[in-house]
Structure formats: C-alpha cells, structure tokens
Curated annotation (Swiss-Prot):
GO terms for biological process: maturation of SSU-rRNA. InterPro entries: KH_dom-like_a/b, RbfA, RbfA_dom_sf, Ribosome-bd_factorA_CS. Keywords: Cytoplasm, Ribosome biogenesis. It is found in: Cytoplasm. This is Ribosome-binding factor A. Belongs to the RbfA family.
Length: 114
C-alpha cells in the first residue's frame, strides 16, 4: 500500500468510526471499534476491519446493519473527505483481537500451572 492510501485509510478509519457511532441510527449496530482500513493503491476499494463487543448474534446483526447503512456511510464520507471517488466499502471482522486474547489466556494458564 502506498503512502497516500495509508493516509486516506487512517482518515477514513476516524470518519467511519464517527459516522457509525454517531450518525447511523440502526439499532442493530452495536458497540464497534474499527481497527484498520486497507485501501487498494487506486483507492477504489476499502476493506474496513472492525471488532464488535458482544456475542455472535450481536456481531451478525452489526454487520447486517452496516451493510444496510453502507450507502449512507459512503455519502457521509463524500461530504467529509476530499476525494474524487469514494471507495467501495467492504466490512470484515478483525479476528486478530480474538486471537491475541486466546494467546493471552494460554499464557496465563501456563503460569497458573507453574
């Protein structure tokens, strides 16, 4: 990823977080944290990685709500960011947090056995 895509991704991360938490009124969208935004070099596609606080049903509901609000989020991004074309948004669950928690639990279990 080039420098411009990185800078735009960081700004998009902040803006999407604000839009999802403050502007989108869908009750299905729970407490979410956007961990990263990866853009293609031509800025046409943005993969938004996020984590959701809650169980599997709440995660699924949040993703359904985000898919439904995708057009609204893109229009808000268009008014907030100075880009010629607003990238297509793809939302994906960031499993690195869960993986890190699993490793942390395993390390704690090893220390308890000693």
């Amino acid at each position: 990823m080039n420098m411009r895509a990185e800078r735009v991704g960081e700004q998009m991360k902040q803006e999407i977080m604000d839009i999802a938490n403050n502007k989108v009124k869908d009750p299905r969208i729970g407490f979410l944290t956007i961990t990263d935004v990866q853009l293609t070099n031509d800025l046409s596609i943005a993969t938004v990685y996020l984590t959701v606080l809650g169980n599997e049903k709440q995660k699924a509901d949040t993703f359904k709500g985000l898919e439904k609000a995708k057009g609204f989020i893109k229009s808000e991004l268009g008014s907030r960011m100075r880009l010629r074309i607003i990238p297509e948004l793809n939302f994906e669950y960031d499993e690195s947090i869960d993986y890190g928690n699993k490793i942390e639990r395993m390390i704690q279990d090893l220390h308890k056995k000693d």
